[in-house]
Amino acid sequence: MSPISTKLMRRRRYEMNNTKFNDLLIKQRGVYNRMKEEQNSGEKNLVVCFTGHRNIAHAVAMQLPSLLDRVLVGLCEQGATVFRTGGAIGFDTVAALKVLELKERYPHIRLELILPCRNQTEYWEETAVRTYRYILEHADSHRYLFDSYVDGCMQERDRRLVDGSDICVAYCNRSRGGTAYTFAYALRAGVEVINLHDLLD
């Protein structure tokens, strides 16, 4: 392929991604307008939850923090105040760390952890456990749904994350598993869903 063709392909990809992101901003403005109407009628502020895969390809993992930054800054600027995550390895961890980072710019926002059980980290590697403890220590609140693991506790955690949320920021590229379950549950509940998978290169 000639250098000119390669350059054109890169330009088209850049324009496509910018179009996707602009569409996302328009969607966020719609959420914000509805939120302002709710505020005027005495309703609550915007609540955002996260769902995403535990295992994420390295190339994707390298892009997620900057993409999350763009999306979450947009939501913060439009009034989002509460961010909920479920404390899992992978996307949940990336999202929680990004919210903690954004608290330096937006000190009024809150990170809330809704955790399936107290022994969630029992079989995790030590590095992941240390990161989990850091997030737990710096979150504004955390709640355990069960004292120890029981069948269905993960799904209950997923439902609790969505219930009461206005928008769900997801990374979902599969049709099965916990993330797909939460994604579908959010759609059925009428929650706005932003799938970061659709915004990646």
Q: In which residue ranges do the predicted regions lie?
A:
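N-terminal amphipathic/basic-hydrophobic helices that include classical n-h-c signal peptides
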Residues: M1-N33
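Acidic/glycine-enriched connector segments
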Residues: F21-L200
